[in-house]
Amino acid sequence: MVSPMSGYTKKNLKQDVENQAPNFGMPEELNARFARTALGGETLGLSLMNLAPGFRIPFGHKHANQEEVYVVLRGSARIKVEEEVVELGELDAIRFDKDTMRAVEAGPDGVEYLAFGAGDDPRDAEMVQGWWSD
């Protein structure tokens, strides 16, 4: 639903926003719904992420010009932030400075989290395959 007269857009993140993970060659253990376009966001981005139990995103990433905040909705995760591994549980929030490399690994029950970011340049992200290896 878009209401230009009232200045808002309403979307259901699971019903109205397509899982983009397959479009980026990601395995079925990752479900990534990027809602910026669906919501008509100009500078604010929102993503709904679901990772299967024990799945680790196969790359680290950072942004040159934007902060991000992740909020765990269900399950648990470990996040490698630069050289530190941080444990997260339900309703934990973590903020990343720009230029901070990170990667997520789901806990034993999987994890569902929201990622919030500000910025509108897709070239802002840097991804490093295999960044978090044991």
Region locations from a protein language model:
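A short, N-terminal "cap"/entry segment at the start of jelly-roll beta-barrel domains
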Residues: 1-44, 53, 125-134
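A generic "binding-loop/recognition-motif" signal
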Residues: 65, 84, 100, 109-110
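Short, conserved beta-strand element in jelly-roll/cupin
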Residues: 48-52, 62-80
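Short histidine-centered beta-strand/loop micro-motifs
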Residues: 36-38, 58-63, 105-106, 130
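Short acidic-glycine-tyrosine-enriched beta hairpin
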Residues: 83-99
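Double-stranded beta-helix
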Residues: 12, 103-134
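Short beta-strand His + acidic residue motifs that chelate non-heme Fe in jelly-roll/DSBH
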Residues: 59, 79-80, 96, 102-108, ...
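Short, charged/polar surface micro-motifs in flexible loops or helix N-caps
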Residues: 40-44, 52-57, 76, 85, ...
